[in-house]
Design a protein with these regions (language model features):
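Two-component system phosphorelay core
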Residues: 2-76, 80-138
């Protein structure tokens, strides 16, 4: 066994686990139905498409701000995600964006990192779920 792989007769490397993060997303289909009822099919699809594009851009922007350690602007960007996600029924994404802003407010940088990257995972899955639910093509 190579050096560093065994500890007290126990093969450490053989015991390494990979944690797979799989987040459940929650979509409020009633919000989407209400949007379609209010705006009609064409109007609602336009709103949903623009919201999805904006969410994708802002998620990327949030990650960039975190890497630059720009907490005030990260907070603003995360807050902006809440309203957009709520508008099209992405309840999980909106809640995690609230968690990011809360972690920033209490200066808990470990929590900011954890919740931000949870937001990235949920954001990606939420965007995919809305595309699939609406049967939209990119």
């Amino acid at each position: 066994v190579p050096w560093g792989h065994e500890y007290m007769g126990f093969n450490v490397v053989a015991q390494i686990l990979t944690v797979i993060h799989k987040e459940n997303v929650r979509l409020d289909s009633d919000k989407l139905s209400d949007l379609y009822a209010q705006l009609g099919e064409a109007g609602a699809e336009d709103v949903v498409c623009r919201a999805i594009e904006e969410l994708a851009v802002r998620l990327s922007h949030c990650e960039r701000l975190w890497r630059q350690n720009d907490m005030p602007n990260l907070r603003k960007s995360a807050r902006s995600l809440i309203a957009i996600a709520d508008q099209i029924g992405m309840t999980a994404m909106a809640q995690v964006a609230r968690d990011v802003t809360g972690a920033i407010d209490i200066d808990d940088f470990a929590a900011v990192a954890a919740t931000l990257f949870r937001l990235m995972r949920i954001g990606e899955r939420s965007l995919t779920a809305v595309w699939e639910q609406q049967d939209l093509s990119v």
